[in-house]
Curated annotation (Swiss-Prot):
Keywords: Antibiotic, Antimicrobial, Bacteriocin, Cell membrane, Membrane, Plasmid, TonB box, Transmembrane, Transmembrane helix. The chain crosses the membrane at residues 455-475, 477-497. GO terms for molecular function: pore-forming activity. This is Colicin-B. This colicin requires TonB for its uptake. Coiled coil: none annotated. It is a multi-pass membrane protein. The keyword Transmembrane helix applies. The keyword Endoplasmic reticulum does not apply. A motif (TonB box) lies at residues 17-24.
Length: 511
């Protein structure tokens, strides 16, 4: 080596029993490399974005420390043939990382409850500047955590690859006011897939693997990540601040996680082969968005937030009407029970309890409901004379169903009064038809039509039950007639919930 050659500083990476070095001014791993430049390129390997070691893998682009964001770049313009994979060296924990500080804020916040009970809480630890949008470069920010930092599941109990493992925390991206952030989230049940790392073959020595080097898929449709893990258990001697371009480290506030969280990141738990002595790693890979993508993501965030708000209001409205309806059915039970006894009161309370807990459930089909109603009407003990039948019809005709529909609609912010007034009046008219002709099909079909047209089953059951129950309470009929109508109402409502209610009416109440 000449004096000039000896004066050239070098950099390198240790792949176990092989050290690959390169001139520090010739290129930087992961940077803009030109084919044919200075490198440790093996003669049999094509030029590429990071060049290759003699064993046939790309030289390490970056060093991953738990909790510290690193930028990994794949330059497609320089890569020839199949991608060999992202290549990183994994080290032991290094200080000056921001995830721990964000986790502390998150844990303190969770002690006081979630900002929104149905969604995870989040604390950001980095703000991301927009990407340049270079289509020839695939860029991912990667950040790792040790297994015990994200889950209580020990390494020995991790499921097979392809299955998910429950985690307490995830590192993900989210949107706030047009800006992309990296954040730690938690507070609700979450899962992350498990992937298996496999040894990387040594191309310079066929039939052998490179010591302490593995590959694993961490992001769909992208090359596997090549991990050099020989330094994982070696303490870091210095503790400088690491700052990537476009990544501004800062600890945010305790907030509700975004509605499009994780839209541009993938996270996995990487398990290494048994006997490797390497502990599993949690890795999150995040795509940095350019300005146009940021605008689209923020629009999607706003739309998702609006959809969530509307859904939340609808759920609150459903719960309100279910509660109100169950109260009315209990009142019906008390009134009719004065004639039919405690068994009817108990049945009414059971129906009311089912109604109160009907949110998220589906009413029985028209055919099933009609099967139950027909069993009830076939009971020879359920008879009424013409005079009493006329009294029931007249009572229904006098009932202001439209007013009842308006009052029902007033219970919910998302209900339209006109729609419910019409539907309540339809219940009135088809109930009259049922009493006059004995044909209850139109009444039951009316309710099913609401659900088919998009009404939630909980709302449909509530409107149907509330209309029938309110009418009975308003009727000024004799005790005998009230008992008959009470059985019909309990049977009609119960038929949409469970066939057992008609069976109880037939065998325990009708005499």
């Amino acid at each position: 080596m000449s004096d000039n050659e000896g004066s050239v500083p070098t950099e390198g990476i240790d792949y176990g029993d092989t050290m690959v070095v390169w001139p520090s001014t010739g290129r930087i791993p992961g940077g803009d490399v030109k084919p044919g430049g200075s490198s440790g390129l093996a003669p049999s390997m094509p030029p590429g974005w990071g060049d290759y070691s003699p064993q046939g893998i790309a030289l390490v682009q970056s060093v991953l420390f738990p909790g510290i964001i690193r930028r990994i770049i794949l330059d497609k313009e320089l890569e020839e043939g199949d991608w060999s994979g992202w290549s990183v060296s994994v080290h032991s924990p290094w200080g000056n990382e921001k995830v721990s500080a964000a986790r502390t804020v998150l844990e303190n916040g969770l002690r006081g409850g979630l900002p929104e009970p149905s969604r995870p809480a989040a604390v950001s630890f980095a703000r991301l500047e927009p990407a340049s949008g270079n289509e020839q470069k695939i860029i991912r920010l990667m950040v790792t955590q040790q297994l015990e930092q994200v889950t209580d599941i020990p390494a020995s109990q991790l499921p097979a690859a392809g299955n998910n493992v429950p985690v307490k925390y995830r590192l993900t991206d989210l949107m706030q006011n047009g800006t992309q952030y990296m954040a730690i989230i938690g507070g609700i049940p979450m899962t992350v897939p498990v992937v298996d790392a496999v040894p990387v073959p040594d191309r310079s020595r066929p039939g052998t693997n490179i010591k302490d080097v593995y590959s694993a898929p961490v992001s769909p449709n992208l090359p596997d990540l090549v991990l050099s893990v020989g330094q994982m258990n070696t303490p870091v001697r210095s503790n400088p601040e690491i700052q990537e371009d476009g990544v501004i480290s800062e600890t945010g506030n305790y907030v509700e996680a975004g509605y499009t969280m994780s839209s541009n990141n993938h996270d996995v738990i990487v398990r290494f082969p048994e006997g490797s002595g390497v502990s599993p790693l949690y890795i999150s890979a995040v795509e940095i968005l350019d300005s146009n993508s940021l605008s689209q993501r923020q629009e999607a965030e706003n739309n998702a937030k609006d959809d969530f708000r509307v859904k939340k209001e609808q759920e609150n409205d459903e719960k309100t009407v279910l509660t109100k309806t169950s109260e009315v059915i209990i009142s019906v039970g008390d009134k009719v029970g004065e004639y039919l006894g405690d068994k009817y009161k108990a049945l009414s309370r059971e129906i009311a309890e089912n109604i109160n807990n009907f949110q998220g459930k589906t009413i029985r089909s028209y055919d099933d409901a009609m099967s139950s109603i027909n069993k009830l009407m076939a009971n020879p003990s359920l008879k009424i004379n013409a005079t009493d039948k006329e009294a029931i019809v007249n009572a229904w005709k006098a009932f202001n169903a439209e007013d009842m529909g308006n009052k029902f609609a007033a219970l919910g912010k998302t209900f339209k009064a006109a729609d419910y007034a019409i539907k309540a009046n339809n219940i009135r008219e088809k109930s009259i038809e049922g009493y006059q002709t004995g044909n209850w099909g139109p009444l039951m079909l009316e309710v099913e039509s609401w659900v088919i047209s998009g009404m939630a089953s909980a709302v449909a059951l509530s409107l149907f039950s509330l209309t029938l129950g309110s009418a009975l309470i308003a009727f000024g009929l004799s005790a005998t007639v009230v008992g008959f109508v009470g059985v019909v109402i309990a049977g009609a409502i119960g038929a949409f919930i469970d066939d057992k209610f008609v069976d109880e009416l037939n065998h325990k109440i009708i005499k």
